[in-house]
Amino acid sequence: MILLFMLSISFMASGASLIVKNGDNIGFLGDSLTQFANREYGFILLVMGALKAEGVKNLKYIPGGVGGDRSNSILARLDKFLAKKPSIVILQVGVNDVSWAKKGVELPQYEKNIREIVARCEKAGARMVLVTPTMHTEDPAFANNVKLEKYAQAVRDIAKEKNIPLVDWQKKMRAVIASNRIPADKGNHLTIDKVHLNGYGNMFLACAILETLGMDKKKVESFIPAWKKIPSMAPILNMWNSPKYRISMDDHAVLYKEAQKNKMTVDAYCRHLIGEKIRELKK
């Protein structure tokens, strides 16, 4: 009886930290990163699959990403998004606010816009999760990334002030790139084109979101082996807006190893293999 009671307490404690509940309707609100995440290998479906595997029932989600969106354009369409009645809103926006030059949004207005988005979502009854903006190129010293760090800090400050769960993707992304532990060519560790996420990028962002939602880190990491087997958008033979060629992260790692032996990028090595095959077929 005592053992059963202790196991019950343990189960309640482990499940109590998950802020997603049965029947939640999770809205993913953002730009093209969020738009493209609504694919088999995208962070949206990875997150939703993990939550369902963890036993959360009757979950729904709203894919609310629009390519090119900035904080002001999200505000302009927010009522339409909220009409779908999300119970949780996961918001990530900012890279276009910085990278769109004259059409971008300066920091004071960006912060004001984020505050208004949060206020309107909460007024509509949604619980918020904030995500710091993604990097623009994988070079931390790039001028836009220096600027983006200030935008990320604004999001951190708002999250802290309002006690909103925070996914610090900007910080996580910089740390993963600096670790140099991804089997990928420089500049494409987490992205396909230095902005839009490849399989690794989607995987790491999904992990960060799930941990912020309260899932145990070891439990989150248990999903990674299966995720690495999903054919995903890789930085080879592709453009971000036409991901017709997909391979799994596991297969990409094999190609990377062979490319390194031949002192080539993975993309160059794949093109080399295609050329060899064509020459073979012509014989």
Language-model features, listed with the residues they occupy:
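Bacterial N-terminal signal peptides
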Residues: I2-S10
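Extended hydrophobic secondary-structure segments that form protein cores and membrane-embedded regions
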Residues: Y61-G65
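Boundary at the C-terminal end of the N-terminal hydrophobic targeting segment
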Residues: A13-S17
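Residue-level marker of alpha-helix boundaries and capping positions
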Residues: N38, G68, P108, N145-V146, ...
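Alpha-helical cap/lid subdomain in secreted, periplasmic
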Residues: V20, L45-K60, S73-S242, K261, ...
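Short amphipathic alpha-helical segments
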Residues: Y245-I247, L255, N262-G275
